[in-house]
Amino acid sequence: MESQNIRIRLKAFDHRVLDQSTREIVSTAKRTGAQVRGPIPLPTRIEKFTVNRSPHIDKKSREQFEIRTHKRLLDIVDPTPQTVDALMKLDLAAGVDVEIKL
């Protein structure tokens, strides 16, 4: 029978909060006896927005803003039922998007 894997994909705008959440997930999984692969840093998505500084004229004067979406990937190999329960009860920081695939 093929072993069950849990793939966790994390996204956040702040890389420090993302790394802290990743460390919490890894320590929880290792404490319950599962093997963890990762965290694997995925490419950062950079969105740039250009707007006019003035509402009426002066097209040459513009301002640029950017938002960076940082991503990490974790694989939990052979999770135990205790691992799944611990991950469900885990309270991560606000601002971190978590996608879990079995």
Swiss-Prot record:
Database matches in Pfam families: Ribosomal_S10
Q: Does the keyword Secreted apply?
A: no
Transmembrane regions: none
InterPro entries the UniProt entry points to = Ribosomal_uS10 (IPR001848), Ribosomal_uS10_CS (IPR018268), Ribosomal_uS10_dom (IPR027486), Ribosomal_uS10_dom_sf (IPR036838)
What GO molecular function terms would the record report? structural constituent of ribosome; tRNA binding
**Protein keywords:** Ribonucleoprotein, Ribosomal protein
Gene name of this polypeptide: rpsJ
Role of this protein: Involved in the binding of tRNA to the ribosomes.
List the PROSITE patterns.
RIBOSOMAL_S10 (PS00361)
Q: What protein family is recorded?
A: Belongs to the universal ribosomal protein uS10 family.
The record's note on quaternary structure and interaction partners says: Part of the 30S ribosomal subunit.
> What's the superkingdom here?
Bacteria
Q: Does Ribonucleoprotein show up as a keyword for this record?
A: yes
Cellular component terms per the entry's GO annotation:
ribonucleoprotein complex; ribosome
One GO BP annotation of this record: translation
Which protein is depicted? Small ribosomal subunit protein uS10
